[in-house]
């Protein structure tokens, strides 16, 4: 038994080290790739100063943090709702953040500062997450809870479409493209949003014990002495914060929160002590690679990154559904 535990621990360490190395390689690729390939040896040149340090570095950091946040949000929500198919986009949390953002643009008539827009996006994500948690407390079946989340997402999407369709504001039309997901407008002025993500990401990665208990089910967690009301609400706030900040920075990006935790679980990383940091690293890798594809797929334009993640993630999602039905 002790030998098996040691083998499992070594295997987990190898996984985390491998993912860390892949994050480093994906970061280097993101900094080099673009309309002009800039090798690391040219990063200190005048061209490198502009393209790498002023344009690509803030974008790469934002992609890395948002990918980690979305994957962690998916892992936390799957433990919270005891449902392996939940994720922020599928349950409408991302759309809730979008509604908060568009409401801020409408009510503020485009005059609100960036930090106020970010806070409104966070508030929208929190409201939808709290509504979902309210549904979960009514002991709905997993399928009904999923349907409730999908319905909330559709309602939020409809509200955004109505607002954009009837608006004459150029800002709201731009938001329609932005809600498809993209990092094209990220620069150092959004650094406060990146900083706002870091402490929550670190805190979530340290909460393996309550999440392991929650993953056992509400009854088992209560029998083990976990204060359910406190931890559920705290994790809901943290998840809403991560999703809201991510949407404020890059728009709605789907499937990262669903696919990444599933893939890692299929690889044997079921303990949240390993799953949480693994999700953060793997989410960062996936979104960095998707961002590189979005930048390089078209010669004279940039694909919305939400399109790339949906194209790659939807087939995986269907496969997971079929696998869970067996």
UniProtKB/Swiss-Prot annotation:
Protein name: Vitamin B12 import system permease protein BtuC
GO MF assignments: vitamin transmembrane transporter activity
Subunit (UniProt): The complex is composed of two ATP-binding proteins (BtuD), two transmembrane proteins (BtuC) and a solute-binding protein (BtuF).
Keywords per UniProt: Cell inner membrane, Cell membrane, Membrane, Transmembrane, Transmembrane helix, Transport
Task of the protein: Part of the ABC transporter complex BtuCDF involved in vitamin B12 import. Involved in the translocation of the substrate across the membrane.
Organism: Salmonella choleraesuis (strain SC-B67)
Cellular component terms (Gene Ontology): plasma membrane
GO biological process, one term: cobalamin transport
Location(s) in or outside the cell: Cell inner membrane
Keyword Transport: yes
One Pfam family in the UniProt entry: FecCD
Claim: Cell membrane is one of the keywords in the record: yes
HAMAP family assigned to the protein according to its UniProt record, in alphabetical order: BtuC (MF_01004)
InterPro entries found in the cross-reference section: ABC_BtuC-like, ABC_transptr_BtuC, ABC_transptr_permease_BtuC
Ranges that cross the membrane: 15-35, 61-81, 88-108, 112-132, 146-166, 184-204, 240-260, 274-294, 302-322
Principal location listed in the UniProt entry: membrane
Family stated for the protein in its record: Belongs to the binding-protein-dependent transport system permease family. FecCD subfamily.
UniProt membrane topology term: Multi-pass membrane protein
């Amino acid at each position: 038994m002790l030998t098996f535990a040691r083998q499992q621990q070594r295997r987990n360490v190898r996984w985390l080290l491998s993912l860390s190395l892949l994050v480093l390689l994906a970061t280097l690729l993101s900094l080099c790739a673009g309309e002009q390939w800039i090798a690391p040896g040219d990063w200190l040149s005048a061209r490198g100063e502009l393209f790498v340090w002023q344009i690509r570095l803030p974008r790469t950091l934002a992609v890395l943090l948002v990918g980690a946040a979305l994957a962690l949000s998916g892992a936390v929500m799957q433990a919270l709702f005891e449902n392996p198919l939940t994720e922020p986009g599928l349950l409408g949390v991302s759309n809730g953040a979008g509604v908060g953002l568009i409401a801020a643009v409408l009510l503020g008539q485009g005059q609100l500062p960036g930090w106020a827009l970010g806070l409104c996006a966070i508030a929208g994500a929190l409201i939808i997450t709290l509504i979902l948690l309210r549904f979960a407390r009514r002991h709905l079946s997993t399928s009904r809870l999923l349907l409730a989340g999908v319905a909330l997402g559709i309602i939020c999407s409809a509200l955004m479409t109505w607002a954009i369709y009837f608006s004459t504001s150029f800002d709201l039309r731009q938001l329609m493209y932005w809600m498809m997901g993209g990092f094209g407008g990220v620069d150092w002025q959004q650094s406060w949003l990146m900083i706002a993500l870091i402490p929550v990401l670190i805190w979530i990665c340290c909460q393996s014990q309550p999440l392991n208990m929650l993953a056992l089910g509400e009854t088992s967690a209560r029998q083990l002495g976990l204060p359910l009301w406190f931890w559920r609400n705290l994790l809901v706030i943290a998840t809403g914060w991560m999703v809201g900040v991510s949407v404020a920075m890059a728009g709605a990006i789907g499937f990262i929160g669903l696919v990444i935790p599933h893939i890692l679980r299929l690889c044997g990383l079921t303990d949240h002590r390993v799953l949480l940091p693994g999700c953060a690293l793997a989410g960062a890798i996936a979104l960095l690679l998707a961002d590189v594809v979005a930048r390089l797929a078209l010669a004279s334009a940039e694909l919305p990154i939400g399109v790339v993640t949906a194209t790659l993630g939807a087939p995986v999602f269907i496969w997971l559904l079929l696998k869970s039905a067996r």
